Amino acid sequence: MLQLPMSARIRLQAINQHIMTSARPAPSTVAGHLAGSSQSWHGKVVPDGPFKPEKGRYRLYIGLFCPFAHRANIVRHLKGLQDTIPVTVVKPYPKGDEKGWPGWQFPSSDSEYPGANPDPLFGAKYLHELYFKDDPEYKGRYSVPLLWDTQTNTVVNNESAELLRDLQTGFNSILPEEYSKVTLYPDHLRGEIDTISTWMQRDLNTGVYKAGFATTQEDYDKNVPVVFAALNKLEKIIAQHGGPFVLGKDLTELDVRAFATVIRFDTVYVQHFKCNLGTIRHDYPQINNWLKNLYWNVPAFKDTTDFKHIKENYTKSHGDINPRAITPLGPWPEVEENYEKDLSKVPTGGVKMPLVLDLEERL
């Protein structure tokens, strides 16, 4: 999520810059960050590197509202890392302070905003204070997720896509076999995962932001159909593989990537980002059924989802989109129940708008 009260277009550019890989200058730290720049940190926990796997050494800073931080937290749970990597949760709103400093805030107590926590390491009031402790001249965004090394008091990594992958393997040497053997990127599915994740990230995970932060009718009209083309494609993939997961019987990082966006879709993206050509529960029965299974039957997904944080972040921190900061009550229920194990009984849906179908064919 974005930290600066910029225009919608600048915010969208910042999101894309955070997510997409680009050429970087030579690093000046062991975490691959160029001091004094806007570059991200790219450190990795490995047994033979400067960031070794140790219980309690690292802390993960997240926002329960942010889909990209959500992905890292889901992996943390799936790998049984809750006791190994504690988390600190920032408040979903407001952003910045009265002096103009941007970034997310920590509550002063656990009761100030349920689910958010005071910073236990430095008593910081704002997330940007941690970034400046590592690099006082840092010029980038103060984003979550952020993996912090308490031993060296430095940032390890703040790239969500890298943490999604690295948390799967970095602590295997100190985990019991029950969790060390868990992989979301199995060898026999890597090609398919890489292919799908490319368009899923571009058209769905970040596609909703391109639509929601559009500043012209032309941009909005261009980006919304792209989102639904990706949903149409995902609907068919789930049906073709027979469930219960995106690629069939194997739970993979595609499920994590898709869940973090889909769980927010009917709740936020339909109304707040005007992605309203359809809804998950009414137009995508395969995705909706898949969502029910993950949410109700795989604890790592439900346990990391907080709809109050999600809804209030979007509706109360995007003043240009929702100036009165009113948070809608619905939809209800947030996630429907009654998962159907036999996918042959679940119809395959999708949005039939001609432009959406044309874009889907190109994926």
Please give the residue ranges for each predicted region.
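C-terminal alpha-helical interaction module
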Residues: M1-L363
